[in-house]
């Protein structure tokens, strides 16, 4: 029985790895290529503008593989974000980008599998050591593999970079000001920040 369970788990992992790039490839085919071209044109047209920001720079934080959405930071990461915000008072710390989706669409947000991910998240809150909670980590790790893949990574990284830019705008970043932007991340978020840069 143990051998059958291990074979079944292996097949599930293989199947999940096979489907992992589909979100970013679907996004690229539907809208990503057009959005990327428009963004390049928009950025080329921006003149240096006045620095009318209340901050000396911006820090965009990308969560680790335990995240379920941009609006939900894993509890173990909160002290780091709070520490950054309290110590770097002249910098705006942004932490509402979900790095494991090219469209910043959290697992529990508007997607066909949202109910499943809400159930898994509820189990994880009740018992952080539950095997079901590891499904979130596994799913996000597979997106991390997509980010690092030479075939699918470029599309994934463009999508993430666009979401970072949208977050900067939402938080008042003056485009064309030349204010520094620093990307940092926890665990897989650090890897994805390299691709988005």
Regions found by a protein language model. Give the residues of each.
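N-terminal membrane-anchoring alpha-helices
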Residues: 1-43
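Active-site catalytic motif of lipid deacylating hydrolases and related acyltransferases
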Residues: 27-28, 61-68, 77-176
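Short boundary motifs at domain starts and secondary-structure transition points
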Residues: 43-53, 173-175
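Electropositive, gly/pro-rich neighborhoods at or near active sites that engage anionic ligands
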Residues: 51-52, 74-77
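A short, charged/proline- and glycine-enriched loop
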Residues: 51-59, 179
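Hydrophobic Val/Ile/Leu positions in short beta-strands of Rossmann-like dinucleotide-binding domains
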Residues: 60-61, 183
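Gly/Ala-rich beta-loop-alpha elbow adjacent to hydrolase catalytic centers
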Residues: 184-189, 193
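The feature captures the conserved acid-bearing segment of alpha/beta-hydrolase catalytic domains
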Residues: 197
């Amino acid at each position: 029985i143990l051998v059958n369970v291990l074979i079944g788990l292996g097949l599930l992992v293989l199947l999940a790895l096979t489907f992992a790039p589909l979100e970013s490839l679907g996004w690229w085919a539907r809208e990503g290529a057009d959005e990327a071209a428009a963004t390049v044109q928009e950025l080329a047209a921006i003149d240096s503008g006045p620095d009318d920001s209340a901050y000396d720079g911006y820090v965009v934080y990308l969560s680790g593989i335990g995240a379920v959405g941009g609006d939900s930071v894993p509890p173990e990461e909160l002290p780091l974000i709070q520490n950054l915000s309290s110590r770097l008072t002249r910098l705006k710390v942004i932490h509402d980008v979900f790095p494991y989706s090219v469209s910043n669409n959290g697992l529990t947000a508007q997607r066909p599998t949202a109910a499943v991910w809400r159930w898994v998240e509820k189990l994880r809150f009740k018992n952080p050591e539950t095997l079901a909670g590891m499904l979130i980590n596994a799913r996000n790790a597979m997106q991390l593999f997509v980010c690092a893949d030479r075939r699918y990574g470029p599309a994934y990284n463009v999508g993430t970079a666009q979401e970072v830019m949208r977050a900067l705008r939402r938080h008042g970043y003056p485009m064309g000001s030349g204010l520094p932007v620093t990307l940092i991340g926890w665990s897989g978020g650090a890897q994805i920040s390299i691709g988005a840069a």
